[in-house]
Amino acid sequence: MIEVAEFIAREVKKGKVIEVGIGFYTRIAKRLKELGFDVLAIDINKDAVVNAKNSGLNAEVDDIFNPNISLYMGAKAIYSIRPTPEMMNYILKISKAVKVPAYIVPLTGDPVPQGMKLITYRGIPIYKWEP
């Protein structure tokens, strides 16, 4: 799954990228940071945010169903690894609001919002929306 970081690094200019719903899996965000990106990890779970901060990442608590849109301003891209189907439309809404690409790696079989383009990178399905 670390290949997702390589893919984003190839697609996105250096700058701020946001991982929505980081949970307790920080490897992709940490790899992007190593590659020179300013990574912001977002999660509604305070323990996940503390874990991300303890891993050396910038992290904030946010509810994407009622987002603090200022957190997303200035981003070059927003991505999410295996978000719930309910989260996907809200990730897309945030991306549209701040006019940046969204990348979603769904769980196998989860429906993806219409309008997203499937890209397969090293066998990993990544869905992209861009303004």
Curated annotation (Swiss-Prot):
Q: Which InterPro entries match?
A: SAM-dependent_MTases_sf, UPF0146
Q: Which domain of life is it from?
A: Archaea
The entry's family comment says: Belongs to the UPF0146 family.
Which HAMAP family does the record associate with it? Answer: UPF0146
What is the name attached to this protein's record?
UPF0146 protein PYRAB01940
Source species, please? Pyrococcus abyssi (strain GE5 / Orsay)
Give the taxonomic lineage as stored in the record.
Archaea, Methanobacteriati, Methanobacteriota, Thermococci, Thermococcales
